[in-house]
Amino acid sequence: MDTQSYKTVSLKAGDIKKEWVVIDATDLVLGRLAARVALVLRGKNKPSFTPHMDCGDNVIILNADKVRLTGKKMTDKVYVRHTGYPGGQRFSTPKEIMAKKPTEVLRMAVKGMLPKNRLGAKLINNLYLYAGNEHPHQAQNPKTITLNEI
């Protein structure tokens, strides 16, 4: 029996092959989309996944403003943040956030599904969100994928 073939392979920084993928978020449910995007950013869809390395792909999401929330979450869900000052607790709904910055709700959803450490902070920088149908990353030759292909 050849024991060499049963060893777990761990990627090195030079072995990582990062790709660029485009996802159209029109009429996709926020949480389902965010979960799949976090999976691709992390690299868990690849057989060469290594937990401590940034081995995921760069993800471009178009039409991030057209993402859908089920039920009455657009007005009833509440995001809570704190300014750091006494009495500084602030509340906002997805509708209010999307009025100011259309891509922020999707960014917060994906960020919440990534690791809460330095790797997670690095991974969120591989996410590119655009409210419209255009993006400036044509030179990277991104491939278009749907949620079912992930």
Set out the residue ranges of the language-model regions:
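Hydrophobic, well-ordered secondary-structure segments
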Residues: 106-107, 111, 124
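C-terminal structural segments of small proteins and small subunits
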Residues: 120-130
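Short, highly charged C-terminal tails/helix-capping segments
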Residues: 129-137
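Ribosome large-subunit tunnel/peptidyl-transferase-proximal elements
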Residues: 1-108, 118, 136-150
